[in-house]
Amino acid sequence: MPLIYVDTLEDPRLDAFARLTEAQLRSKLEPERALFIAESQKVIERAFEGGMEPISLLMEEKWLPSMAPLIERMEERAGMRPGGEGLPVFMAPHDELERLTGFELTRGALGAFRRPALPTVADVLHEARLVAVLEDITNHTNVGAIFRSAAALGVDAVLVSPACYDPLYRRAVRVSMGTVFQVPWTRIGDENVPNRSGCGTWSNEGIAELHEHGFTCAAMALSDDSMTPDELSALLAARETASG
């Protein structure tokens, strides 16, 4: 693996970690160049095990021994030969990494990964029995927490509405502890249709699509007449300020 030592985050090779905004990382106009950032060794490992393609790593040197086996696996899967070009691994001072992340980076490293193309709804629902649908969740921390809960509860897949915040946003990935790479997910509904009154909503076609796949749609609420999701079920979680 090539080790690249940098003294400052101003190095242009670290743009993906230090300067690109989330919108720039997503690169909608050039999706083949889109990236996302994973923080901590555990999340990086889960991203890799979830089939994500690593582009480069950034860490403090003391974490290299614990990361080395994972880096070796990354290079092996990419067909990189030992002693060859390898996966770029940037080494930065502790203070610079703390300044970048905004907190004490006690769990190792950051990884830049290629953002994958989203699967179709049909692909995600294949063999799924319990699905969570996130409608317009507009808080990245909540998105990550819901994915973590979904993984713990055995949810088979997650569908997110067009206006729901991005599950691959850096904070969402971190809060999810990498479960966004373990639970299959995709977008449902037409992203080009504004999700506001009078302009149509994702549910016009999205709910029908779920019904076509045999799912019963149920809102998540405390109620005496609540159902038990014994059959194919899609649990709908609305945005934080929704009522009714």
Language-model regions, residue ranges each:
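A general structural signal for well-ordered alpha-helical segments in protein cores
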Residues: 13-17, 44, 97, 106, ...
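Short active-site oxyanion
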Residues: 32-35, 53-56, 86-88, 157-158, ...
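Boundary-proximal intrinsically disordered activation/regulatory segments immediately upstream
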Residues: 1-68, 72, 164-165
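A contiguous loop/helix-start segment that scaffolds small-molecule binding in enzyme catalytic cores
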Residues: 229-244
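RNA substrate-binding interface of SAM-dependent RNA methyltransferases
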Residues: 4, 42, 49, 81-86, ...
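Short basic, glycine-rich beta-strand/loop surfaces that mediate nucleic-acid
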Residues: 108-112, 174, 240-244
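Glycine/small-residue-rich loop that forms an oxyanion/phosphate-binding "nest" at active or ligand-binding sites
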Residues: 72-79, 87-106
